[in-house]
């Protein structure tokens, strides 16, 4: 193919090619490719001379059977890459056949054998005025850099429809119908020897001479179902710019799954819609692996992977090149509500430091390719905050935060209010969770309700007289400052999944993006029955017993024996906890919940501070100084990840964010490229 510099001053070569001699792969003789290729203004030797760098070799046959005129339009010397602006985009996944509302019957045809006609519909985006025409059973011709399609019959084409610029436009032409049953079976599919395309959607830019010949082509085939109906399948997409035909290949990993029509997406599918690198799980992925076209790596991990392995981490196929694709946008003002972006915050700071070396124009910032193509990444529907619902149950999920990037105000409680609030909420949480835990266990009989109520009142009255002296109302000012951070019981390596609307970093470690993503990943997930059932203990209030001593709630204190209530003898097998007054169901009956009786070692339980409640879940903690699993009760209101070392026997060591892998240098083992190839309306590339 020669060097680029040798073509700049060369004339157009006049080649007399007979009609029976065309470019096809595999060629009848000789080689299809040269021994090197040029990309990003640099020359690279081809380690696989007969290997197509961007897909299967058979895809080359869609590029046309004749060579294009050269020399190509060379980019300016200071810009080694010439960006191609794609003005039209047909969303090939939206191409479909729609049955007509009324079946068309021909003259002399029996009533029971009416033909079924279809309309062709699809969705497209355009940045200019466009004229769209549909052809059937057409061949392709290139003349003076302009693509034209000729059907075998003039009736096998639709009228030309003109559209203005706009996104998400629907093509629907009710006056034009098609009946694939009239064609032979071999005409429904594409045959390379015949060079006839069953369906061609030709969208041409209709805006003067500046974009003359600029068009987008969607090739498709028809398939017949066993029931006699037909459907259309997209085959390939092509873009013609400046007289050169480009084959469009799909990049795997940039689709936006949240925009699909199926709203009931599994959690595994949602977690796959993240923008993070699949190796480090922290940086934004921006590097494409060729020829498999998996966008799954960040630039740092891609450089490291070149020295460690030569296989794609997704499909395990060997790769021959790495292509970095970056999109940039103007920096938003400090007062803009969307100026804080959760996915690209760390990438933005890095790009500002190295803007001179990475050729980032001043006033622009690098954004995620997924966000540039699909819009702002939004997580699942907003999760309600952690509060007690109207029916007395505690919502088993963490609060969600908006895109403004700041925490909601936290109400500071006095020691007395904190104690009463913790007791009330803890009992309600235990009630809701014990329902989920004991779904498969035996249900209390109705005749035991009255006896269990009186027994629980007896236990509360006995515990009123005994209080722990350490758990007084003394609260240091530091303990009242609530900080949201990652919970120690969560594996941070697994909390990388969903794209978030905002991230919140701990004040102690502002750069720990993985911790913030762990918290927000927890916020977007709900406590299911299986998750609760896996816990070996139940959630109890911090006012329950510890070594036979307890702190009663103010509401429970009002139910003392001094009110004249009877105190029956306590049975040995009574294992119930009393509820405060007012906890009744819809019929007015008192609700009594049985504590969890799963086989747990008595000396192996420990409690964890979770929003003022104590948790007997026996989860292992990543704390080096753990000597036993029992800890003292803490009356402080703590959020996940914040442990008061002064009142716990557990060592207070916060989990730190996993360090980022060092940035590897470029080497000669494999070819690496850094190219800005994304052109978006209103963005700078």
UniProtKB/Swiss-Prot annotation:
Start-end of Low complexity biased regions: 434-443, 552-561
CDD domains found in the cross-reference section: mRING-HC-C3HC5_RNF157
Motif (D-box 1): 329-332
Keyword Zinc-finger in record: yes
Disulfide-bond pairs as recorded: none
Zinc finger (RING-type): 276-315
CC per GO annotation: cell body; cytoplasm
Primary site of residence: cytoplasm
One of the record's GO molecular function terms: zinc ion binding
Reactions catalysed, as given in the entry: S-ubiquitinyl-[E2 ubiquitin-conjugating enzyme]-L-cysteine + [acceptor protein]-L-lysine = [E2 ubiquitin-conjugating enzyme]-L-cysteine + N(6)-ubiquitinyl-[acceptor protein]-L-lysine
Localization of this protein: Cytoplasm
Keyword Zinc set for record: yes
Region of interest called Disordered, as start-end residue ranges on this chain: 339-361, 433-584, 650-672
Motif (D-box 2): 657-660
Function: E3 ubiquitin ligase that ubiquitinates APBB1 for its degradation by the proteasome and thus prevents apoptosis and promotes survival of neurons. Has a dual role in neurons as it is also required for dendrite growth and maintenance for which its ligase activity is not critical. May act as a scaffold molecule to regulate this process. Acts as a downstream effector of the interconnected PI3K and MAPK signaling pathways and thus participates in the regulation of the cell cycle.
Free-text comment on this protein's domains from its UniProt entry: The D-box motifs play a key role in RNF157 stabilization.
Protein name listed in UniProt: E3 ubiquitin ligase Rnf157
Organism, scientific name: Mus musculus (Mouse)
Name of the gene this protein is made from: Rnf157
